[in-house]
Amino acid sequence: MAHILNGCSFYKGLYIARHDRLVDLVSQELRQVQDRTTHMYKHSTVKLNWFDHNCTDNNILCNIPNTPDIVFINQARKSLTIFEIGCAFDLYLDTCFTSKFMKYQPLVECITALGYNCQLIILVFGSLGHVHKVVLRGLQMGGLQKADAKRVQKFCSVSATIGSLHIWKRRCVVYP
C-alpha cells in the first residue's frame, strides 16, 4: 500500500496534485494572518535579489536546494519564514520530516548569513490521514491561533486522505 500511495512513478502526477493541494490550503490560511508588508512566494526558487544585503558572492544560493513550498519574507523586520510541506506514508512521517529538515537547513544558514532571521517550518501529513506531531505548533508559529491551526490541520489531513483515495481508485481502474 505504501508503494501505491507514495512511491510508484506511474502515479507521480497524482502525488504532486495531492501535495500541491496541501500547499494551496496552507498558504491560503497563512496569507490571511500575515501583515501587508510580508511578501509570499509559492513554489518559487529563492533568489538573491529578494534580500537587502551586502553579499558579493552571487553563487551563495547555488548548489543547495532552494525551492521551498512557501516563503514569507518581511523586509522591514528582515525576517523570512520557509514552509515545507510533505505527504508521506503514515509510517514514515518522522523520516519525511528529517529529510525535509536536512534538505533545507543549508538554505536557512545562507539566509541567516545575509543578516535575516530565518525560520524553517516543516509540515508533514500522512497519506492515510495521520499528522506529524509538530504540525499544530508549526501552523501556530506561522501566525494562526490554536483553534484555526487545529482546523487547518484537520482539513489538510482530510485533503491528503481524499487525494490518496483518488490514487487508490486510479490504481483499481488500471489494475482491476
Question: Model segments located where?
Answer:
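Domain-level recognition of nuclease-like catalytic cores that cleave nucleotide substrates
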Residues: 118-176
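Metal-dependent nuclease catalytic cores in nucleic-acid-processing enzymes
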Residues: 30, 101-116
